[in-house]
């Protein structure tokens, strides 16, 4: 483990020098006005090289179903997490990420309807989807809810049934998909007004080596082209 007094020296060892970093700067100004400030800032950063020779190159993930059950006291509630992951990327990463976000929103709507409205056994359902290209591709979808311990099996079975139904009869979810796409486009119109959106987008595009700048220009068209199938 890492001791507290070792954390800052380790950080400086790995990330202290500015060499080979890419800086993303946004501002309502001209390059002529801000260039002296950028030069002064970067020129004042520590020089030298970072110690990054060691790289973690692979992920060891299980390829079969497994369960982890832990009893933590006498609480009358059970916290359930279903995790699905894969390591095969069959399309462009940006397209995969967008479709994952669509799937996440659709799945949450379906599970809320089934587990809360129909079964009445949960207050809410969380669905999260994430993916990364490095050190090797891995995507993960997580479904979570809190329920009575005696309801765990029936809720897990119902969740799996909804996943199977979404896979076998995608056209029956067209109404939900339409709402999801409409909300994505609304969110995009708001997000693109924020500097934080652009800095994160540029940073992630450079880091992932996915510098397709036309993607944002064609975002609405791409979203509208997604079908349930």
Residue ranges with predicted function:
Residues 1-52, 119, 124-229:
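Charge-rich, well-structured scaffold segments of protease-associated domains
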